């Protein structure tokens, strides 16, 4: 019997190495801090620590940690042991993309843990079924003109039709590998060659959205409901990419009526599939990506607006566990 959510809980965060956290902006850190503030035990591991062996439950070599409240060291380790994932009240999967074969295998290990009784967020099957770039195909009414193909001819025809286009690989993150080609088609051949690798790699091509000048908006869904503020990531200098990792500037702002319309249409559907935390990327009025692996921007929104996103997330997690 799981405790009602006014009782203290054990949360396992599967994350990137703790030593690499940039705590001034890290979303997983803000989740851990909020959980600890409520008296919950924070435990961490990396995907490399997780194993399944016949006759045993899926388990991990975990680190019990205490957040110090300081910049460095930001945590102290209070113990290390092997524990079954099903013995935690919640397992929060926070490993960054890329969604490569290792990530795919991780979702299967976590799926096995789920069958054994572990409560994993986001749901491993849902992580697998929602590749960040391709998940938008399910909601064509909200997206810009888009093409997904391996064919150079298709890409050239799409360019001839739309003029200004953006080309992106399906497995990039943080704006990696994203190219803009103008109506003149300058460099289109070289870019197709780079991304498409002679027809071996699938490419996504979209009509260029001039709204990017006002920012690539990250709209967060928690338990299917939109956070009232988004983070507009505004390209700097000569960039067409707003991603913070590509030097974009993050400006928090209230979500627009269109942002809310998209969020309220997708929210309940995605939440019902076990996606407790989702980051929608919206440029102008168009949905461009659905991020499910490790959505970020909690700290930026909270610092600029006072809306405590980590609190909203842990509230939703506690409520879900009590349900």
Predicted regions and their residues:
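Short, Lys/Arg-enriched N-terminal segments with co-localized hydrophobic residues
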Residues: 1-8
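ATP-dependent carboxylate activation and anion-phosphoryl transfer catalytic cores
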Residues: 9, 14-15, 21-24, 238, ...
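Anion (oxyanion) recognition and catalysis
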Residues: 36, 114, 159-160, 271
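Hydrophobic beta-strand scaffold residues
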Residues: 42, 120, 165-166, 277
């Amino acid at each position: 019997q799981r405790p009602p959510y006014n009782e203290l809980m054990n949360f396992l965060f599967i994350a990137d190495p703790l030593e690499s956290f940039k705590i001034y902006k890290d979303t997983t850190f803000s989740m851990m801090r909020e959980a600890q503030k409520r008296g919950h035990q924070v435990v961490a591991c990396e995907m490399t620590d997780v194993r399944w062996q016949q006759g045993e439950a899926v388990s991990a070599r975990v680190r019990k940690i205490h957040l110090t409240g300081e910049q460095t060291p930001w945590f102290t380790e209070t113990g290390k042991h092997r524990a079954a994932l099903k013995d935690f009240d919640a397992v929060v999967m926070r490993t960054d993309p890329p969604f490569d074969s290792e990530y795919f295998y991780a979702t299967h290990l976590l799926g096995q843990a789920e069958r054994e009784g572990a409560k994993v967020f986001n749901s491993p099957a849902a992580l697998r079924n929602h590749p960040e770039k391709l998940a938008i195909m399910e909601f064509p009414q909200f997206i810009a003109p888009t093409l997904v193909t391996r064919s150079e001819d298709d890409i050239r025809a799409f360019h001839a039709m739309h003029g200004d286009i953006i080309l992106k690989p399906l497995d990039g993150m943080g704006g990696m590998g994203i190219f803009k080609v103008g109506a003149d088609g300058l460099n289109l051949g070289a870019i197709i060659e780079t991304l498409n690798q002679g027809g071996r790699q699938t490419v996504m091509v979209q009509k260029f959205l001039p709204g990017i000048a006002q920012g690539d908006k990250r709209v967060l869904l928690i338990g299917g409901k939109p956070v009232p503020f988004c983070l507009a990531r505004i390209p700097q200098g000569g960039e067409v990419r707003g991603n913070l990792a590509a030097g974009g500037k993050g400006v928090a702002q209230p979500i627009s009526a269109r942002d809310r319309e998209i969020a309220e249409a997708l929210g309940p559907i995605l939440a019902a599939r076990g996606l407790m935390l989702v980051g929608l990327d919206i440029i102008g009025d168009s949905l461009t990506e659905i991020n499910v692996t490790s959505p970020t921007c909690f700290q930026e929104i909270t610092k600029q607006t006072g809306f405590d996103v980590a609190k909203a997330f842990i509230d939703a997690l506690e409520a879900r566990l009590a349900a």
